C-alpha cells in the first residue's frame, strides 16, 4: 500500500496509483515509443481533476488519503 512521492522515479508501465496524491500521475518522456525518465508529477488543475477521477478506485488510496472519494473541480472561467 505504499506510493511514490512527487518528483521521484515511477514505472511507466504501471498505472498512476503508484504515485502519491490524488492529482499525481506517472509522467514519462516518450522516446520512439519507449517511455523513459518517468517521474511522479502533477499537471494543472484540469489535468489534476481527470487524474483524480481515475485514481478514485486505486486499491492503495489509503497510502495518501483517508479514503475520501472526491476530486476538486478545476476553476472554469474563474468561478470556483
Swiss-Prot record:
Q: Which UniProt keywords apply?
A: Calcium channel impairing toxin, Disulfide bond, Ion channel impairing toxin, Knottin, Neurotoxin, Secreted, Toxin, Voltage-gated calcium channel impairing toxin
Cell compartment(s), UniProt = Secreted
What disulfide bonds does the UniProt entry report for this chain?
A: 3-20, 10-26, 17-52, 19-40, 28-38, 58-71, 75-80
- Record remark on domains: The presence of a 'disulfide through disulfide knot' structurally defines this protein as a knottin.
**Member of which family?**
Belongs to the neurotoxin 04 (omega-agtx) family. 03 (type II/III omega-agtx) subfamily.
* Record's function text: Omega-agatoxin are antagonists of voltage-gated calcium channels (Cav). Induces rapid general flaccid paralysis followed by death when injected into the cerebral ventricle of mice at dose levels of 3 ug per mouse.
Protein name (Swiss-Prot/TrEMBL): U20-ctenitoxin-Pn1a
The source organism is Phoneutria nigriventer (Brazilian armed spider)
